[in-house]
Regions:
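Glycine-rich, aromatic-lined ligand/substrate-binding cores of catalytic
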Residues: 194-227
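C-terminal extracellular loops and terminal segments
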Residues: 78-87, 129-154, 191-206, 234-238, ...
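Extracytoplasmic gating/loop element in the C-terminal half of outer-membrane beta-barrel translocons
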Residues: 219-303
Length: 341
C-alpha cells in the first residue's frame, strides 16, 4: 500500500511522526487525451500585424481525480482513481502588432484569448444515491462541495440554494427547494457553476526609446467560480464579541448574521473573474563601455503588481475553486544588473 508520514504519536512531551498505509487503486491507469485541431497563421502590412487562430477538440479517457469512497472499504476515506471521460473544445486567438517602429521608437503589443468548453461525458463510478461523483473536499470528515456529473462541466459546485429576505439578507437555515418553496431542508443541487474558467486572456506590451525600455504583461480568467471556504468556516457571529464600540465581528459576518456554520450554502459561492498585472519593468542599457564591446543593462521590476476582481477573498486564482489555506502571492520588487563583455 501507499504510505505517507501523516500519523504522529506522543511519547512524553514530544510528538513522533510515522508512516501509515493509505488507500490506492491497483487498477489505476494513465490518463490519455486525443487532440484534433485546425489552425491558421496570418500576417499583414509586412507583419506589422500578425497572429494565429486555432480550433481544437480533445477527448480525455480514464480521467484521474481524487474522490470519496465508502467507509471501511479502504485505508482512507478518499482515493485517486479513473472516474470517467471528458470532452473539451475551444478556440485560441492571438494577435500581435507593431504600431510604432522608427529609428528611436518601437512599440509592440500582444493579445491572446482562449475560449474553452468542457463536459463530462461518462462516469465509471457513481455514488450510490445519485448520478455523480463527489469531489472538492472541504474537511477531513467527508464534506464536499463539487461533483463530476454527466452533461456538466468538471468541478461543478453542488450546494444548497440560500433563501433571502425582502431586504436581500440571507435567512439562516432556510433554503430554496426545487419546487420554489423555502424550508429548512438543506437540498443540494448542481449549480451549473464550475471552478474552471470558460475564457482566458493574456496581454503584453513593450515600448522602447533609444536605450530605454518599458514593458507590462498580465493575464486574466473569466467564467469561473470560487467557494470561499475561509468565509464559510469562520463567519459565525456567535464566536465573536460585541461590546458596543469594542467589537471584533467581521463586517461580512455581521452582514450575513449567521450564528452557525452554513457550509453548504451557495451564499459563499462567488464569481472568480479577475485580471492580474503580472509584471512591470523599466530598463536602461549602457552601451559601448570600456573597450567599446561591453554593455550594462539595469532593470527595475515589479511582480504581482495588481489584481482586479470582485472576489472578496485573498486571491481568486485558485485552480480547485475552493479558497482554503491559500498562501498569499507576494509582491516582489527587484533591481537587476546584466553585464556583457
Amino acid at each position: 500500500t501507499v504510505s505517507y508520514p501523516e500519523s504522529c504519536y506522543q511519547f512524553g512531551d514530544k510528538w513522533y511522526y510515522t508512516y501509515r498505509p493509505n488507500g490506492y487503486d491497483s487498477d489505476i491507469k494513465w490518463e490519455t487525451t486525443e487532440t484534433y485541431n485546425i489552425g491558421l497563421d496570418y500576417g499583414f502590412l509586412n507583419n506589422r500585424i500578425y497572429g494565429s487562430v486555432d480550433y481544437y477538440q480533445r477527448h480525455t479517457k480514464d480521467l484521474l481525480n481524487t474522490i470519496n469512497v465508502i467507509s471501511g472499504t479502504n485505508y482512507s476515506s478518499v482515493i485517486t482513481t479513473n472516474i470517467g471521460e471528458m470532452d473539451n473544445k475551444g478556440v485560441e486567438f492571438a494577435i500581435n502588432a507593431v504600431p510604432i517602429h522608427t529609428k528611436n521608437w518601437k512599440w509592440t503589443v500582444g493579445l491572446n484569448y482562449t475560449w474553452n468548453d468542457s463536459e463530462i461525458t461518462k462516469l465509471n463510478v457513481i455514488d450510490s444515491d445519485a448520478n455523480f461523483v463527489q469531489t472538492g473536499a472541504i474537511s477531513g470528515t467527508g464534506k464536499t462541495v463539487q461533483v463530476f456529473m454527466v452533461g456538466q462541466r468538471p468541478y461543478t459546485f453542488y450546494l444548497a440554494k440560500q433563501a433571502y429576505d425582502d431586504n436581500g439578507k440571507p435567512i439562516e437555515g432556510q433554503y430554496v427547494q426545487p419546487d420554489g418553496s423555502i424550508s429548512a431542508t438543506e437540498t443540494k443541487y448542481a449549480t451549473n457553476k464550475s471552478a474552471l474558467p470558460t475564457s482566458y486572456l493574456g496581454f503584453n506590451t513593450q515600448l522602447t526609446y533609444k536605450n530605454w525600455d518599458f514593458a507590462i504583461s498580465g493575464h486574466g480568467a473569466f467564467g469561473n467560480y470560487v467557494y470561499n471556504y475561509v468565509a464559510a468556516d469562520q463567519y459565525v457571529q456567535s464566536v465573536y464579541s460585541d461590546q458596543g464600540n469594542f467589537s471584533n465581528i467581521l463586517r461580512r459576518t455581521k452582514d450575513s448574521g449567521f450564528q452557525n456554520q452554513q457550509l453548504y450554502s451557495d451564499y459563499f459561492l462567488e464569481k472568480g473573474n479577475f485580471f492580474r498585472i503580472d509584471n512591470i519593468s523599466l530598463g536602461y542599457t549602457f552601451q559601448k563601455l570600456w573597450n567599446g564591446s561591453s554593455s550594462l543593462r539595469l532593470t527595475l521590476g515589479v511582480q504581482n503588481v495588481a489584481t482586479f476582481t470582485g472576489y472578496s477573498g485573498i486571491d481568486p486564482e485558485i485552480y480547485s475553486g475552493i479558497d482554503k489555506e491559500v498562501y498569499p502571492r507576494p509582491r516582489v520588487f527587484s533591481l537587476s544588473a546584466n553585464l556583457n563583455f
